[in-house]
């Protein structure tokens, strides 16, 4: 099944689809991988971790698919801690270096999704290692928000967190959410 995840993400779909809010794409993920996501959230895909590509597939399921399956819902972020821990372990053992540059950035996305300033310091280094100015630019945009607010204000509504006046004003500006 890990091969199907990687094929779906990297071969059958494009970056334009990865980053767009597309109900049809979200439904394709729900139909093909909804049950798999539930298993991943329970830690049941641990056998995938024997290979770098398997680790990557598990991280994509937890980090990326969660956002597509549960838009505007707290469950979109419920697996972030697990995805980050898996990504940190993958980086620690060098699994991120065993895949192509295009795929490698998905080992780093859980760092970008973190609401920790310390984690974003590491993320800048990781994304900088890709020799991909666009990926680094997006990480830096995320980091600016975390440095300023200590969290992503655009998640507040989904997570039932109160927004400060400064966050409300910020959310009215361009590029305030992703």
What are the roles of these predicted feature ranges?
Residues 1-56, 61-178:
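Intrinsically disordered, low-complexity activation-like regions
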């Amino acid at each position: 099944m890990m091969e199907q995840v990687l094929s779906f993400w990297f071969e059958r779909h494009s970056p334009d689809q990865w980053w767009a809010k597309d109900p049809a794409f979200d439904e394709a993920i729900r139909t093909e991988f909804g049950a798999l996501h539930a298993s991943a959230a329970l830690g049941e895909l641990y056998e995938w971790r024997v290979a770098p590509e398997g680790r990557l597939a598990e991280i994509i399921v937890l980090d990326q698919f969660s956002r597509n399956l549960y838009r505007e819902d707290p469950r979109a972020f419920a697996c972030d801690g697990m995805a980050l821990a898996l990504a940190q372990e993958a980086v620690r053992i060098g699994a991120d270096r065993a895949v192509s540059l295009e795929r490698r950035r998905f080992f780093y996305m859980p760092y970008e999704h973190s609401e920790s300033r310390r984690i974003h310091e590491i993320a800048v280094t990781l994304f900088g290692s890709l020799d991909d100015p666009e990926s680094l630019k997006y990480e830096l945009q995320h980091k600016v928000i975390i440095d300023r607010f200590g969290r992503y204000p655009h998640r507040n509504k989904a997570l039932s967190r109160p927004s400060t006046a400064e966050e409300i004003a910020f959310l009215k500006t361009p590029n305030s959410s992703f």
